[in-house]
Amino acid sequence: MLAIISPAKTLDFESAVKNFPVSQPHFTDYSEQLIEVCRKLSPQDLSSLMSISDKLAGLNAARFAEWTKIHNENNSRPALFAFKGDVYTGLDADSLSEDDVIFAQSHLRMLSGLYGLLKPLDLMQPYRLEMGTKLANPKGKDLYAFWGNVITQAVQQAIDAQGDNVLVNLASDEYYKSVKESQINAKIIKPVFLDNKNGKYKVISFYAKKARGLMCRYIIQHHLTEIEQLKEFDLGGYWFDSASSTETEFVFKRDINE
């Protein structure tokens, strides 16, 4: 079983990280090409392109300038511990055991606009480059054109290494679009998280993001290998609703106490 998740805009390169045997990101040749494109953009260009403040644009221009193909523990940190958005709040990597992190290294991948696909212990440098960014590059008008089949093939290789042909899609639509589903040879399960608010079950973005992280944590902590085991997920008060689910879309519901 392989789970895929999105990265996060919020990063943590300050707090202490446990000592794990780190790995190198696989697609730095591609990353370097994107960095070269980004370095040609002014902070004003970045602000417009990414719809971010001047302050954030300046920070990211500096990050692009400082980025280097050489990744070590002085300029990088493992991706699993660098991302700190809503999904990663649910995942709570800092509290995972060493065995859990080792399991995650084989069973979890993070999609990335800059790095393509990251293993949890792959080193990464601070950056902001969302997959949906319309960054013109030598291969096309955006990052989907740039990555082409590269991410899809890497995901398939990771699935093949599991031997059970199961992909759990916990990524956002923006990032999952970089995976060409028609080319994936696996049973793809998409968990959907619905919260009951004012008498109606619906997707509430903040809660859904955190729930995707919780599901990721559940897979990692229980070392899941079977599809049916996903239905036992109960973290955060969610429960599997078989009546609303299909063979490939697993619906989990929760009642919010106001």
Swiss-Prot record:
It comes from the Bacteria. Pfam families: H2O2_YaaD. GO terms for cellular component: cytosol. GO terms for biological process: response to hydroperoxide. HAMAP family: UPF0246. Belongs to the UPF0246 family. This is UPF0246 protein CGSHiEE_07045. It comes from Haemophilus influenzae (strain PittEE).
